[in-house]
Amino acid sequence: MEKMTIRDVDLKGKRVIMRVDFNVPVKDGVVQDDTRIRAALPTIKYALEQGAKVILLSHLGRPKGEPSPEFSLAPVAKRLSELLGKEVKFVPAVVGDEVKKAVEELKEGEVLLLENTRFHPGETKNDPELAKFWASLADIHVNDAFGTAHRAHASNVGIAQFIPSVAGFLMEKEIKFLSKVTYNPEKPYVVVLGGAKVSDKIGVITNLMEKADRILIGGAMMFTFLKALGKEVGSSRVEEDKIDLAKELLEKAKEKGVEIVLPVDAVIAQKIEPGVEKKVVRIDDGIPEGWMGLDIGPETIELFKQKLSDAKTVVWNGPMGVFEIDDFAEGTKQVALAIAALTEKGAITVVGGGDSAAAVNKFGLEDKFSHVSTGGGASLEFLEGKELPGIASIADKKKITRKLILAGNWKMHKTISEAKKFVSLLVNELHDVKEFEIVVCPPFTALSEVGEILSGRNIKLGAQNVFYEDQGAFTGEISPLMLQEIGVEYVIVGHSERRRIFKEDDEFINRKVKAVLEKGMTPILCVGETLEEREKGLTFCVVEKQVREGFYGLDKEEAKRVVIAYEPVWAIGTGRVATPQQAQEVHAFIRKLLSEMYDEETAGSIRILYGGSIKPDNFLGLIVQKDIDGGLVGGASLKESFIELARIMRGVIS
C-alpha cells in the first residue's frame, strides 16, 4: 500500500492538525518514559520547518469520555516543549471557543497541544460532529499515531471524512516495514511468537503461515501447544478451550510445509516472584504439578538461535517469558540478541509493539532492529492481514493510469498585456512540470500572443469556445480552423455558462465536439447538474443525457480523445464545492456509463476532470479520488494560486 505522506503536501502557512500518540506513563505530573513523544518529533519538526501551524491531538490512558486530572496532557506539553526547545502552547479543552481562539492566534512555526481527546465521549465513538469540529480547525490532517491505527476514532479516522489525511513519518515507517514482512518477505522468513495467549495470536499464525518458513513459539502460549501434543505442563498457564485449535494449527502447518518449533526445555517456578526457587526441566520429562513454566530454557535458547541463523526476514511479537522479572528474562534477552545480530548481517527484523517493545527497551536494544513498532494491538492486526481503519483513512498515492490535466479557464478576464504577463509567470514557475499536462484558456483576444509565449513550452494553449463550421456568415464566432492555426490544442465546449446564458443544447455541443476532433484538437466537454436538479435527485439522469448526446456518433478512437469536465453548476463561482465523495460518485458514474457506451478499455482511457470552485484548500481531497483526473479551474486559475494547485497535483502523483 502506498499512502500519501506529509512530504507530498505544501505546508507553508497551512493549519495542520496532527494525530500523535502521546499515551505515555505520567507520575506526579512528570512523564516517566518519553519514547513515544520522541518518536513523533521528526514529523512535528518537519511541519514546523515547512512553516505550518501545528495543532496536536492525542489521547492518554482511558478517562471514559470525561475530564480526569490524572490523564491530562499538561505534563506532556511541558516535556514536548523541552524536547523541541520551544514553547508548546496548551489548551485544557478539546472543543469550544477556547480552542478556536487558540488556533486563530497560532502563527507559522508554532505548536498547540489540545487536551486529551478521550475527555470527550465522541472520540471513541467516532462522532462525526466532533470530527467535523476538529477538521474545521485545519487545512490538512496528518496521522502519525500508528498505535491507534486499529481503532476508528474521531481524531484519526473521523477527521479524514472532512479534510485530506496524510501519513506522518512514523506512520510511514510502520506501514513500510510491516507491509514488507506481511506481504513481501525475503526468504528464509522466521516468525517468533510469545506472550500469554494463543487466542491473541491466532490471526497472526494463520496469516503468516502462508508465507513463513518457520514459526518459533515461546512465552506462556507455548504450553497450550505442548498440552495439545500430550505433554505434562504442570500448573503452567494453558487456554483449555484453545487446545483443539492448537492441534489444528499444528496440522495446518504440517500440510503447508511450515516448521513449527516448540521449546524443548523450560525454566519453572512455583510463584511468579523475584528470588524464588527455580529450575530447568526438559519438556519431555514433564513439568511437575504446582510448578509453572515462566521462561524458555537454555537448550531452547540454542535451538531458537540455530533456527534463526539463516533468516533474511524476522518478525518477533511477544516475550519468551516473564521478562519483567530478571530471573525469567534470559530467554527473551537471548532471542532479542540473536535477532539483533541478524540485523547487522542485513536481515529485515521487525519487533511488534507492546511487551516485545518494552523488552527491547529493557535490554537497551531499541536501535538494533530494522524497526520496533510503536503499536501493540495495531501491529498484531496488521500482521493478521486486516485493514486498519486508521491507515485506510489516509489518502492513497494516486496510481496514475491516465495523464492528469490541470486546466485554467480564464473566462472573460485579463487584457492582452495582463495575459502575457501572467502566462510568463506560469512558464517561469512551472517550466519543469512533466508529470501532468497544464492547459491555459485565455480570452480569444489574447490567444495569439499567449500562444507565442507558450510555443515549445510544456504548458498547452486552450480556447474557451468554438463554432462548428470552418467559415461562413456567423458574425462574432471563431472557427476550429482559426484555432488550429493559432496553435490551440484544447477547446472547452458545453460549459454550463454557455448552456445557461447562450442556450446551447446537447445537439449543438455535439457538433462542436466533432468539429474540434476533426481538426486534431482535444475537446473538453463540460457536463453537470444545477442545484435544483441535484435536490430533485436528477444528477445522474442529467449527466447521462449530456454525456450520451455529447459523444453521439463518436467511435472508440474518437471517444478516447475527448476530455470530460464534470462541473456541478451549483458549485461554479458560488464558493461552494462538491465534497470529494460527491465528486467521486459522479466521476465513477460517468466512467461506468462510458464502459456501457463503449467498453472498459475505452472508458479507462478517457480523462474526467472536476470543475467547480477549485481552490488550493480543497483540491487535494478531490485530486486523490480514483476517478478524478485533474481540474478545470476558474477563478483560482487567474492568480498565483494556480501555481499552488500544480504543486498539489505534483505531490499526489506516485
Curated annotation (Swiss-Prot):
Pfam families: PGK, TIM. Pathway: Carbohydrate degradation; glycolysis; D-glyceraldehyde 3-phosphate from glycerone phosphate: step 1/1; Carbohydrate degradation; glycolysis; pyruvate from D-glyceraldehyde 3-phosphate: step 2/5. Substrate binds at residues 21-23, 36, 59-62, 118, 151, 409-411, 572, 634-635. The active site is at H495 (electrophile), E567 (proton acceptor). It comes from the Bacteria. InterPro entries: Aldolase_TIM, Phosphoglycerate_kinase, Phosphoglycerate_kinase_CS, Phosphoglycerate_kinase_N, Phosphoglycerate_kinase_sf, TIM_sf, TrioseP_Isoase_bac/euk, Triosephosphate_isomerase. ATP binds at K201, G293, N317, E324, G353, G354, D355, S356. The keyword Lyase does not apply. Keywords: ATP-binding, Cytoplasm, Fatty acid biosynthesis, Fatty acid metabolism, Gluconeogenesis, Glycolysis, Isomerase, Kinase, Lipid biosynthesis, Lipid metabolism, Multifunctional enzyme, Nucleotide-binding, Transferase. It is found in: Cytoplasm. Residues 1-399 are annotated as: Phosphoglycerate kinase. One of its GO terms (molecular function) is triose-phosphate isomerase activity. Its EC number is 2.7.2.3, 5.3.1.1. The keyword Lipid metabolism applies. GO terms for biological process: fatty acid biosynthetic process; gluconeogenesis; glycolytic process. CDD domains: Phosphoglycerate_kinase (cd00318), TIM (cd00311). GO terms for cellular component: cytosol. It catalyses: (2R)-3-phosphoglycerate + ATP = (2R)-3-phospho-glyceroyl phosphate + ADP; D-glyceraldehyde 3-phosphate = dihydroxyacetone phosphate. Monomer (PGK) and homotetramer (PGK-TIM). This is Bifunctional PGK/TIM. The lineage of its organism: Bacteria, Thermotogati, Thermotogota, Thermotogae, Thermotogales. The gene is pgk/tpi.
